[in-house]
Amino acid sequence: MTTSIIKNQEIKNKLSNPELRLKDIIKTLPKECFQQNRRKAWTQALLSVVMVGLGYWSLAIAPWFLLPIAWIFTGTALTGFFVIGHDCGHRSFAKRRWVNDLVGHIFMMPLIYPFHSWRIKHNHHHKHTNKLDEDNAWHPIRPEVFASWGKTRQSAFKLFMRQRLWWVGSVGHWAVVHFDWRKFKVKDQADVKLSVAVVVLFAAVAFPTLIATTGIWGFVKFWFVPWLGYHFWMSTFTIVHHTYPDVPFEAENKWHEAMAQLFGTIHCDYPKWVEVLCHDINVHVPHHLSTAIPSYNLRLAYSSIQENWGDYLHDELRFSWSLMKLITDECQLYQTDVGYQPFKDYYAGR
């Protein structure tokens, strides 16, 4: 860990050079990375539809003892739905905006995720990646903020981190952030209202129909548990993308765009079947250099980044329980200009 910290401090010093601009890094990427391919885009969409269909078929025929496997598969396949919507939100799925909006709404509808709400908030994350008090994805809690909370809220947050409940984090983010159009700029509120109406209408039709035909257990079996499976991956991808003991979050006056997007974004390998079903969302460094890169070109772009900027990249990670244990045990609070602080160090200093 010490060697890694020293290396990463050297990288930070290099990237803090104000002459290094994000657009200079983007210029080194092959033009092919930005080319949209209609066949590849729709093949990915079809793959997700087939895999989700396969998942629901397995849920329908599986004996009770095989349901956990079917739930895991279906939840992961549904994450592919989100990734298709993700490309649509960045306008990298199709050249026509109306196609992106239509496909985005269709694929995020079963997840009850308002498309425009997510798109707008997610774009803010890209503009302010790893910037303290601005990034709205997985943002660390500063000690002074934690100290200002009441005992109940502090206890809830400590329980969340210590019991490693990161996997439900995106459920709270989904519920709190995406349905209240008053939290958006006036110019965006009409789009947000439309997306909220779409998912509310879908739920109003699909949920009663599902319950009427399969009962409450059918609702839990066919929608709720797979939906939680999707949120497991949503939460996991989101936290791992930008969180590690040596990855900095900077105050606005010290924030450096190239530093945040190139070094502050982490490549993590997952089981191959997860990467296929989720359309390489784990190959995340290129996506933070340019959101115009379609998901099917991420690996091509990452190979170029490794070749030209490999010395500036964070060490690659591999998804495992030990990785998630490290993140949730060490990345609990964040001291400005210092780094992450576990609760035990916070309380030891008081």
From Swiss-Prot:
Cysteines engaged in disulfide bonds, as pairs: none
Reactions catalysed, as given in the entry: a 1-[(9Z)-octadecenoyl]-2-acyl-glycerolipid + 2 reduced [2Fe-2S]-[ferredoxin] + O2 + 2 H(+) = a 1-[(9Z,12Z)-octadecdienoyl]-2-acyl-glycerolipid + 2 oxidized [2Fe-2S]-[ferredoxin] + 2 H2O
A molecular function GO annotation: oxidoreductase activity
Keyword Transmembrane helix included in the entry's annotation: yes
Species name: Anabaena variabilis
Protein name: sn-1 oleoyl-lipid 12-desaturase
UniProt membrane topology term: Multi-pass membrane protein
Record keywords, A-Z: Fatty acid biosynthesis, Fatty acid metabolism, Iron, Lipid biosynthesis, Lipid metabolism, Membrane, Oxidoreductase, Transmembrane, Transmembrane helix
